[in-house]
């Protein structure tokens, strides 16, 4: 059985606010902790009315403080938005507070629109600088030399696991060349999944951080007690994707019984294309879909995610997936 992990974006639902979203994230993480999931990751997004995890490192600390065993990390920190030294200090602090429980996943996308990226002081050469920034960040975690003028405190000498995240061959090749674990964002960017995984494994060079390739991929999961309820729960995320694609992001809408009453066939097809890798339905249906995804990819670890309006339904979905996991 491979490890199962969870990705959460701290969704803000219609009628709710950021405080509710963060409270529900903690409740979800506590359920994942209780159910034996390996990791609970949070994503950096900015200027998104429906996502409360913009200050990712702070939310990680909140979740780690409210859980006992599960690893907590970033899925991910968008490194070009930050100075590598600051990231090392933040995650060095988290590792000091919660030793052996912190992961640092790194991405190179802005996690927002162009205007917000500029407000973050992100300049567009930042993505081109990403490989250098990753190497610099790794170096900040190395033990400091006696005469080193600048060091990460806390951070220097701490072994915080660093992952590269991505949705393209670029990140896959870089992760392989640096000998780092790799996580692919197949939950919203399915097109290049298999190509990227193959490239990562082919390019992998053993490092002092990782002896052999370790690949994780994400899949949307809407697990419920019946197939019909799973399909209904998935309609919130379909609506959200359509709104985002038309430049109108908002809070997460409630599910509907019949998605065809509010979206056009073209909109539904577009959303389903982005959500190609999804497991939707009752326990047996979800088990079959997860089995197929793991067999297709040969991944070493599975990450599940899913934007649902009702947090009780999200927790129930994790419970069903945990039950399914034990049957592998």
List the predicted regions and their residue ranges.
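N-terminal beta1-alpha1-beta2 module of alpha/beta enzyme domains
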Residues: 1-70
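A conserved active-site cap/scaffold subdomain adjacent to cofactor or substrate pockets
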Residues: 172, 176-191, 196-197
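Active-site mouth loops of central-metabolism enzymes
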Residues: 8-23, 77-85, 156-166, 274-283
């Amino acid at each position: 059985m491979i490890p199962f992990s969870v990705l959460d974006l701290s969704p803000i639902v219609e009628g709710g606010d950021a405080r509710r979203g963060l409270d529900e994230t903690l409740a979800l993480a506590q359920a994942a902790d209780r159910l034996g999931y390996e990791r609970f990751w949070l994503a950096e997004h900015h200027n998104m009315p429906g996502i409360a995890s913009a200050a990712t490192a702070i939310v990680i600390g909140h979740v780690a403080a409210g859980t006992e065993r599960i690893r907590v990390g970033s899925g991910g920190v968008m490194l070009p938005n930050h100075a590598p030294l600051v990231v090392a200090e933040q995650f060095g602090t988290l590792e000091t507070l919660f030793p052996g429980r912190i992961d640092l996943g790194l991405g190179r996308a802005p996690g927002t629109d162009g205007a917000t990226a500029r407000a973050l002081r992100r300049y567009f050469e930042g993505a081109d600088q990403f490989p250098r920034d990753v190497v610099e960040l790794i170096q900040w975690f190395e033990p400091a030399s006696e005469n080193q003028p600048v060091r990460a405190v806390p951070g220097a000498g701490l072994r915080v696991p660093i992952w590269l995240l991505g949705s393209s061959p670029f990140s896959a090749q870089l992760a392989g060349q640096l000998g780092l674990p790799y996580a692919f964002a197949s939950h919203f960017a399915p097109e290049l999944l298999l190509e990227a995984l193959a490239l990562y494994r082919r390019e992998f060079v053993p490092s002092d951080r990782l002896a052999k390739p370790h690949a994780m991929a994400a899949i949307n999961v809407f697990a419920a007690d019946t197939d019909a309820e799973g399909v209904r729960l998935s309609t919130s995320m379909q609506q959200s994707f359509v709104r985002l694609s038309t430049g109108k992001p908002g809070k997460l809408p409630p599910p509907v019984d019949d998605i065809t009453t509010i979206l056009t066939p073209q909109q539904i097809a577009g959303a389903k294309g982005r959500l190609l890798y999804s497991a939707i339905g009752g326990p047996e249906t979800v088990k079959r879909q997860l089995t197929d995804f793991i067999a297709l990819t040969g991944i070493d670890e599975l990450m599940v995610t899913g934007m649902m309006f009702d947090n009780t339904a999200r927790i129930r979905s994790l419970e069903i997936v945990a039950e399914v996991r034990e049957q592998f």
